[in-house]
Amino acid sequence: MNAEMAGRRAIKMVSEVVNFTVLLVVVLLLAYAFYSLWDSQQIYQAAEKSNYAIYKPTVENEGKTFKELQAINPEVIAWLSVYGTNIDYPLTQGQDNMKYVNTNAEGLYSLSGSIFLDYRNNKDFTDFNSIIYGHNMDKKAMFGEIDSFSDRRIFDTHQYGNLYFDGTDHSIEFFAFVHTDAYNSEILTPNVREEERQRYLDNLLAAATHKRAVNISTDDHIVLLVSCSSRSTNGRNILVGKVTDEINRVLSAQTDCIIVDQFSSNNENGSIMPIFLWHILLKLILALIITIRIYTIYHKQN
């Protein structure tokens, strides 16, 4: 009898240890899930264009607030806007192409990084082709809307932008959208030499998914807005525009872009839900199932 009772106590003790361990796992899963939500929210908040709105150069402030940002970080060289989108950010340039991958425009560490000009380009945009990079982020942050230009409707209704540098506004007229590989040196090489410009331009237009008729020559200056693609690991989406001294403040009538993030997947209705949120949701469901199981076992034993 004593042996039987001792056996039961041992089984109960083991069961309690198992239950406690499972409960601990549940708590850790919940803690991780909520931390992931908080952390991702912090990243997206840091990337919002509203964080830099006070620095945006305008006719009214004569660029004084922009100069204040340059005083904070001298590597801020310009301001880029794509009309009808949330792309409205200061533009930086480092001594390499790595610094501003995880540094914001104020020079502080940030996973959302900055929009930045290739270090091999001249900051006065006198090169034939200047390459500008930005993260493909959810919630229309940074270059999160470049991906949406693969939709012909979006491309057709978002034709203009603005590039402010050297104290002056310059118009951008977008004329091509290209999807290519990250290692395509025929397109992703900045500051092409004069004798190679026509071939470069021909290759660019031949690779374009969408394009419109714009007078463009080897004497012009073009910018390539480059971001990661949601379609492939090494894919790059590129919005190409011609920089002119003519100021065109025409806003696109279409402002509701269909955003596809590099970390997103489509459901049956075509809506977007980031994969990391699915992971968190599954962890929460698993934690709930385990908690119910522990509760059931505990009450059966008592």
Where are these regions (language model features)?
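Alpha-helical transmembrane segments
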Residues: 14-31, 279-297
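N-terminal Lys/Arg-rich, disordered targeting/topogenic segments
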Residues: 1-15, 302
